[in-house]
């Protein structure tokens, strides 16, 4: 379905520079777009691509349009303060227009306990299991093999992709998106040591601590494929509104993730950690348990966080990749730091003795 720039602006705002009747039916990158496609400029370093793009129209910020000057002549633009966000909203619209409607109803192979409550407008796919006391609200879509445990609520308009498991006693807010293979509400990693003795004489075992809390997820949360969120030991693990979690993320029991925080793939967050609002956690970050990150904290990829970071800012502890030979030389220096320290101390002592400086 093609829409004019005028129609897009009526729906999403912005101002038109060029032909308001220019039609676009899809989106593409600046360097690949053709007539009938909408591109966007989010990074000024690609400004030169706007001059050569074949796109029918370009989403652009006012300051970047000014930089184009005469090169903008004859081209079509939607001018908006945030072209990237505008692009995302238009992309969502095109996806919705192209998606075939799913008819409400329950697939014959689904298993639904009589004590569960499923809205008439819900879409329940093949081999879905819904246990007693579960509530499936209006417009929910549960794809094949989804499991919803007893007493769990899935909020209105949510979409759970195939093979998602939501254990008992959890709550997922409205408009959530949970991708394939995610597990919500599995037991937290809680074991009490019951050992006697030391070393080889040590005897005893680990005693499992029942995890009697749940998981509470706010509205507009998205959870990536194969991500796991553990239930709380006593109180709930909490994911606040509009949190976005990538694939293969582990969130331990009793954590609280603040609203509008984003967490990239393979991050691991140990139990009882609190992350503030509007934080950004990079890929493969590891965060120790029982620490607190304040609002607006950014932790870069592969960093390890072992203590609280209460102040907003950017934090890094990862070592960036370097040439292998350079790495070996650096590693050799690190191994010899103790010797170098001792040599420097000896030199300082000798120099102080020559000066008669007994305080050194």
Swiss-Prot record:
Homotrimer. One of its GO terms (biological process) is lipid A biosynthetic process. The active site is at residue 253. It is an enzyme of class 2 (transferase). InterPro entries: Hexapep (IPR001451), Hexapep_transf_CS (IPR018357), LpxD (IPR007691), Trimer_LpxA-like_sf (IPR011004), UDP_GlcNAc_AcTrfase_non-rep (IPR020573). GO terms for molecular function: N-acyltransferase activity. This is UDP-3-O-acylglucosamine N-acyltransferase. CDD domains: LbH_LpxD. It comes from the Bacteria. Catalyzes the N-acylation of UDP-3-O-acylglucosamine using 3-hydroxyacyl-ACP as the acyl donor. Is involved in the biosynthesis of lipid A, a phosphorylated glycolipid that anchors the lipopolysaccharide to the outer membrane of the cell. Belongs to the transferase hexapeptide repeat family. LpxD subfamily. Pathway: Bacterial outer membrane biogenesis; LPS lipid A biosynthesis. Pfam families: Hexapep, Hexapep_2, LpxD.
């Amino acid at each position: 379905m093609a829409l004019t720039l005028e129609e897009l602006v009526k729906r999403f705002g912005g101002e038109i520079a060029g032909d308001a009747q220019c039609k676009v039916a899809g989106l593409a990158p600046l360097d690949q777009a053709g007539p009938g496609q909408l591109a966007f400029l989010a990074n000024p370093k690609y400004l030169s691509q706007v001059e050569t793009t074949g796109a029918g129209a370009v989403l652009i910020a006012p300051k970047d349009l000014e930089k184009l000057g005469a090169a903008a002549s004859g081209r079509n633009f939607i001018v908006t303060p945030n072209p990237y966000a505008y692009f995302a909203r238009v992309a969502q619209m095109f996806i919705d227009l192209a998606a075939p409607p799913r008819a409400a109803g329950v697939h014959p192979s689904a298993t639904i306990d009589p004590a569960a409550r499923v809205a008439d407008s819900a879409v329940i796919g093949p081999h879905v299991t819904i246990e007693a006391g579960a509530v499936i609200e209006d417009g929910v879509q549960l794809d094949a093999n989804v499991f919803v445990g007893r007493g769990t609520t899935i909020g209105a308009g949510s979409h759970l992709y195939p093979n998602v498991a939501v254990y008992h006693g959890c709550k997922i807010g409205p408009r959530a998106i949970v991708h394939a293979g995610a597990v919500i509400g599995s037991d937290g990693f809680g074991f009490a040591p019951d050992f006697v003795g030391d070393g080889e004489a040590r005897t005893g075992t680990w005693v499992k601590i029942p995890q009697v809390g749940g998981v509470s997820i706010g509205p507009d949360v998205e959870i990536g494929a194969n991500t796991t969120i553990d239930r709380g030991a006593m109180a709930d693990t909490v994911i606040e509104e509009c949190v976005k979690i990538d694939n293969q993320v582990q969130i331990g029991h009793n954590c609280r993730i603040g609203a509008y925080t984003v967490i990239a793939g393979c991050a691991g967050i140990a139990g009882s950690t609190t992350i503030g609002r509007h934080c950004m956690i990079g890929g493969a970050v590891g965060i120790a348990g029982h620490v607190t990150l304040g609002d607006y904290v950014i932790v870069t990829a592969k960093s390890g966080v072992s203590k609280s970071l209460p102040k907003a800012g950017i934090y890094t502890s990862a070592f960036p990749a370097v040439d292998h030979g350079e790495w070996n030389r650096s590693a050799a220096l690190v191994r010899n730091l103790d010797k170098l320290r001792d040599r420097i101390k000896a030199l300082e002592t000798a120099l102080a003795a020559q000066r008669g400086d007994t305080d050194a």
